[in-house]
Amino acid sequence: MASARIADQGRTGRTGASGSGICPSCGARRMVDSAALLVDDILPRVPLRQWVLSAPFPLRFLFASHPQVMGKALGVVYRCIATHLIHKARLTHASAKTGAVTFIQRFGSALNLNVHFHMLFLDGVYRVSEDGEDDAPPVFRRVKAPSPEELQALVQTISQRLARFLVREGLLVQDAENSYLALESDDEDSPLPHLQQHSITYRIAVGPQQGRKVFTLQTIPPKHGEHPPLSPVGKEAGFSLHAGVTTAADQRDKLERICRYIARPAVSEKRLSLTHNGQVRYRLKTPYKDGTTHVIFEPLDFMARLAALVPKPRVNLTRFHGVFAPNSHHRVTITPARRGKGKPVDHDDQETTPEQQRQKMTWARRLKRVFNFDIEVCERCAGPVRVIACIDDPAVINAILTHLAKKEENERAATPTRAPPAITLIEQQLAQLTRKT
């Protein structure tokens, strides 16, 4: 909690927790910082395209429980898409380079465990010298958007290469009739795999209703028949590949909104509420085809859902590929920050580097950047506001919040002051008195 002062006035506001894996406030802070880092320091002013890959249920559990396998599988996916872009530009891997930034999302709209990849790819390639001795800067060459046929062929290639990768790793067993994953649990006594399996399949994990489907609310009519998607989607064996969102080179505001969207926290407080009988109600971001708009949890099962969404320790959910990788020789010449492997570009000593600007981005500046709301200026008198104290004692915070809640209740319960009589009513009364006299 932060206490601020405006000249002779005072203001108290709440700030977020620190370090929670699923805390909405901490997640929002990371969302803003990540988007600012990408737009200011990493992503160049060239067209970009978002590729989204979803995997079948068994692979979602594999990626959630074995992060090292997920990292290798993500490398397979990146190489498939990068090869597609390079070949479409009619170049080779030696003469062209591309890059991407991947956000690994672990959650779905219904708070279900759904590990999938949001990849911000260069919408083209950089042409480079094949021998690596030419000092000329890389030249960007854009490629056309993928057609529905290309998306379908690409998702089939990804599915086949991931299957071969899992067979080599000894994780996928194939026979004449079917194929299945052969997984070994790192900790057989841990309840986390049980919670993850139920979360992936939309089932209740704990309590007397264990194993049943989560209770849902259908508040709108279902959609009948097939409704074609707004943009092409490739589907194959449980995989889904979408690439319909793009940004032009000069659309930096749109790019930052996309970055904030794919880096958003798992839980949205605006969609979360309690029912009259104490159950947890969560509104879906997009209604299902059958008209489902909400999911209902018992409090204990809701906690189990949150536990399943927490990643393992020291698992990086943001990955950099190609020219954006830290060890890439081209990063120093392509990224706006001009930092990377090789000789760094000299900066003016009087200028502030992007890293220093990011370190100075306080929570007030984050609010102003995202919501265009300046917490350092009073909305009533336009006077300057400064933070005079940060409070972390739970007892003091609870006492202040209780006092503020009572103050708001008293203000709402106070009898509203009577408005002045309308001018027309006064004129009518004066006219009547005039006629009588």
Regions found by a protein language model. Give the residues of each.
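Beta->alpha loop/short-helix hinge microenvironment recognizer with preference
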Residues: M1-T437
